[in-house]
A protein has these predicted regions:
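Zinc-dependent deaminase
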Residues: 1-7, 80-151
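Short beta-strand scaffold segments in enzyme catalytic cores
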Residues: 15-23
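Short beta->alpha transition motifs characteristic of CBS
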Residues: 26-33
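A short, polar/charged loop-to-alpha-helix boundary motif
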Residues: 35-46
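Short helix-loop-beta connector
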Residues: 58-62, 195-197
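Local cysteine-cluster metal-coordination motifs and their immediate loop/turn environment
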Residues: 65-85
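Alpha/beta-hydrolase fold catalytic core
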Residues: 143-201
Length: 205
């Protein structure tokens, strides 16, 4: 989690990883693709590269990798190639997760090496770090849009606090003001919520 927070502070998607051997952390990594201009620099890859240098071997026999987010297909393939004994992840990734969410590369008996995988460990804490990061990013983008597309003097300016009383509404409001059809007005909308939500609120003004 500390590595994930460090990634967020650097403007990267907050994912962190550590590699453990014989009960000791031998390497760590955080997301670095933006800063390093490297599409492969996911936290898991960074950590595995560091561990391989420590051990003097790309095969990480006897090692376990802990990561805050379910690994993608690229990272999962590298983990299998590195002969990791076990992979433990926190939050599931319903969009690119390759350890059970979208596909499961670890559940293929035809592969020449099998790596155990366990998910959901401290998933709540891991999810919060991600949610906070993307919420802040959306807020920054909304503020930039508002600055580029100021509201008309007669536009309604309902404070965000007015929506705080809606049941099951812990998410940040989102806005659109750059559509030509709005003509200087602002549309407020909600496009996220729990999968099992009993009601859907559409807020337009």
């Amino acid at each position: 989690l500390a590595q994930a927070r460090a990634a967020a502070a650097a403007g990267e998607v907050p994912v962190g990883a550590v590699i453990v051997k014989d009960g000791q952390v031998i390497a760590s990594g955080r997301n670095r693709p933006i800063g390093s201009h490297d599409p492969t620099a996911h936290a898991e890859i960074v950590a595995m590269r560091a561990a391989a240098l420590v051990l003097g071997n790309y095969r990480l026999d006897g090692c376990e990798l802990f990561v805050t987010l379910e690994p993608c297909a690229m990272c999962s393939g590298a983990m299998l190639h590195a002969r990791l004994n076990r992979v433990v992840f926190g939050a599931a990734d319903p969009k690119t997760g390759a350890a059970g969410s979208v596909l499961n590369l670890f559940d293929n008996a035809n592969l020449n090496h099998q790596t155990k995988v366990e998910g959901g460990v401290q998933s709540g804490a891991c999810s919060v770090v991600l949610q906070d990061f993307f919420r802040n990013k959306r807020n920054e983008q909304d503020q930039q849009k508002r600055a580029l597309h100021p509201l008309r003097d007669d536009a309604l300016r309902t404070p965000d606090a007015q929506f705080a009383g809606l049941p099951d509404y812990p998410w940040e409001p989102r806005y659109v003001s750059d559509l030509p059809a709005l003509d200087g007005l602002r549309m407020h909308y909600l496009d996220e919520g729990p999968a099992d939500a009993g009601r859907v609120y559409l807020c337009l003004h």
